[in-house]
Amino acid sequence: MLKIGLTGSIGMGKSTVGKLFAEAGIPLNDSDAVVHNLYAGEAAPLVNAAFPGTMKDGAVDRHELGRQLALDPEGFKRLEAIVHPLVRKREMEFLAKQQADGAEMVLLDIPLLFETGAWERVDVIVVVSTDSQIQRQRVLAREDMTEEKFDMILSRQTPDAEKRRRADYLVDTSHSIAETRAQVLEIIAELKMRIAKGDFRNA
């Protein structure tokens, strides 16, 4: 079973590309969605223990957590030590199910693919990218986003140029959704051909 790692910096269109892969029939494990799910349940008391006052009605108050992290950027390490093992556990459960179901390939949407070393456990890396001005416009249009918050997030992510350099495939989201979809379908078609040729014998 071929494991495709999908990544891209904030505002590049990674989530949209992930959905396009899923629409094309590729099973998707979305790390962001898993974190949202964990914050609404299992991880909430653990996060609250490390960041007092961040739990509200049994779930993580993301706004309060973000406020505390902005004041103490070192807190990201504590948060990741709590969340990453839980996300990894869910990922392994997803992979086991897809393997049992006979999936030919799966997509792992991992925002911090390079930063966490997750790139080592995938067979192919797809990076989503766009022009830096388009990226900035998209991100600053989000609710509760500021220039300072955007710059802080970027500082924690591998630079786009480095991601592009390490990609096996690149999806450019600078243009229309139709053009983005065409790129995704082309990648899937090529990967299916490569699987048939035996390019991924260890996958």
Swiss-Prot record:
GO terms for biological process: coenzyme A biosynthetic process. It comes from the Bacteria. ATP binds at residues 11-16. It catalyses: 3'-dephospho-CoA + ATP = ADP + CoA + H(+). GO terms for cellular component: cytoplasm. Keywords: ATP-binding, Coenzyme A biosynthesis, Cytoplasm, Kinase, Nucleotide-binding, Transferase. Residues 3-202 form the DPCK domain. The keyword Kinase applies. Gene3D superfamilies: P-loop containing nucleotide triphosphate hydrolases (3.40.50.300). Its main location: cytoplasm. It is an enzyme of class 2 (transferase). It is found in: Cytoplasm. GO terms for molecular function: ATP binding; dephospho-CoA kinase activity. Belongs to the CoaE family. Catalyzes the phosphorylation of the 3'-hydroxyl group of dephosphocoenzyme A to form coenzyme A. HAMAP family: Dephospho_CoA_kinase. This is Dephospho-CoA kinase. It comes from Rhizobium etli (strain ATCC 51251 / DSM 11541 / JCM 21823 / NBRC 15573 / CFN 42).
